[in-house]
C-alpha cells in the first residue's frame, strides 16, 4: 500500500540522507542530476557544485527540486520531493554554509556508515584544484513524500 508521508516524516527522510537528485530547467528542458546535499532540518538545503551547466541554468531559472529515496526493494521504499528556490551564496555566508554542509555530512556518514571522514573530498568530488566552488542553497517551498510497505 502506498501512503503519503507526513511533513515530519518527509523532513526526516531528507535529513537522514545526503545524496539526492537535483531537478532544474535549462532551455525549456528538464534535467535531473545526482548531487550531494545537506538539509539543515528547518527549511534549507545546502549544496555546492563546480561552475558549469547546472549553475548557469539555475541562475536563469531559480525554481528547482530535490528528490531523495530510500529503496529497500520494490515493496518497501520511501521517497520525498522538495520544491524550492535556488540562491547562490557568497562571502561569509558561503563559507559558513560550506562548513555546515561538510560537518553535517561527515556526521551522517559516521552515524549511518560508521566511517570517520576528515576531508570534503572523501565524500564529494566537486572541488578541483584552483577552482572555486559555487555554494548555494535551496529554500524549500513545499515538501511531499510517499512510501510503500507491503
Model-derived features with residue positions:
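Short, basic/aromatic recognition patches
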Residues: 1-20
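Short beta-strand segments
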Residues: 17-50, 66-67
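Short, structured patches in soluble enzyme cores that scaffold and shape functional sites
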Residues: 26, 68-70, 139-142
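Beta-strand-connecting loop/turn residues
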Residues: 42-44, 62, 141
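Surface loops and adjacent helix of pleckstrin homology
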Residues: 50, 69, 148-150
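Helix-adjacent hinge/juxtasegments
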Residues: 54-87
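Charged, gly/pro-rich active-site loop segments
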Residues: 78-150
